[in-house]
Amino acid sequence: MSRDVSPLPLICFLLGIPRSGTTLLAHLLQQHPDITAPPEPWLMLALEAFGRVDHRHPAGASLIQVAACEFLGRIDRISVSRVFADAAYSQYLAAAGKRTLIDKTPRYWMVLDYLHSLYPEAPHILLLRNPYAIAASLKSTWGVPFVSERCPPTSVSCLAELVTGTPTAAVALALADLVLGLPALAMQRGRRHTQVVRYERLVERPDEEIQRVIAGLGYDPAGIVFAGVEQTEYLRLSSFGDRRLLKKKAVDNRSVETWRTELTIEEMQTVTDLVGADLLVELGYEQSLQHARDAGIVDRGKAVTERYRRVFQTWWDLRRGEGEGIPAGACEYNSIFQQAEEDNTISSSSSTLGEAQRLPEFKLGENLQLGASMVAQLKRALMASEDDRATQLEALRNRDAAIEALRREVVRLEQSLTK
């Protein structure tokens, strides 16, 4: 089944943001007898975060992180991680009786540099899909809202709401996939050993596209006779992957244009603002952009999209605890506020400040104003949280007092019964 002209890859990474069709593509590729594609291993994300644990860890999250980083800093962490990953992938392949594993994990856009350093020679398959269609799928499948009266486009309140959990982390991450993940993956198109697959062409001509990708991996495309959606039981047994594939009988293109009726004009406007008209055109979706314009949306310019990216990047850096002046491993908002007060400056992320310095239209004063407003809103959120905690503590004390009173009453009744 396999060619002998070049060594076959142990691991291939399938990249694409959530709801772009990665589950379908992985399923079709693993119909080749030498290829397996487990549902979303997330292994690279776990390895990249090695040493960072939940702040509730009883041993102390900051102690674990500092100690692990200190120890790993004395060795070649990348080579050690590579050995672990090779062992994990190899054991999975051996158990499956396959030769190449396709790691399909949509949020690998978050660790692309780590991915490249760990597996610089690994082939990549980059799946691109119309951002409007992705948004429609996020809306219909996960209920992700794209219109919010509480959070006007690119307003400072957006950042404060993101950090304080409104919208929920799941919704914010889904939006970050579009705002940060899509442009990050778009930059991978020219990378060596990268095959680009377009979702629209995949569902129009599945056999042709799968055979092309299989050949690009070094395998004989004749190994796949028909690209169908049978044998999806492995998805039913997993917590990950697109569950809709379980209901499919065949590959079809019905989902390519449904966004035109599923998204409102306001939602199309939001998607255009989040992604940017320039990126839509760059990725080849100018016809979709024109349809949205004909429907009534306007191109608000690069500044709006860049502002969204800065807001989400700042939120993302705060989540990771990597913002400037934020202690390593800090997971509590208290740590953020204390550092901000000590410095009497803005703890905006280094990556965001760097980006602002590179973009003349965004001045440092605007960044400081954005950060100052964010800190003020977060302080108010903290005060509200502390008030809520005080109320809950008072309720607990009242509950404990009531329990103690009941215990005394039980003792009194027991004593009266024994007399």
From Swiss-Prot:
Coiled-coil region(s):
none
* A molecular-function term among this protein's GO annotations: protein-tyrosine sulfotransferase activity
- Domain of life per record: Bacteria
E.C. number, please? Answer: 2.8.2.-
Q: Which InterPro entries does its entry note?
A: P-loop_NTPase, TPST-like
Which key words tag this protein in UniProt? Answer: Nodulation, Plasmid, Transferase
**The keyword Transferase appears for this protein:** yes
Give the Pfam families listed for this entry: Sulfotransfer_3 (PF13469)
**What does it do?**
Required for the formation of sulfated nod factor. Proposed to transfer activated sulfate (PAPS) to the fucose of the nod factor.
What protein name is recorded for this chain?
A: Nodulation protein NoeE
What organism does the UniProt record list as the source?
Answer: Sinorhizobium fredii (strain NBRC 101917 / NGR234)
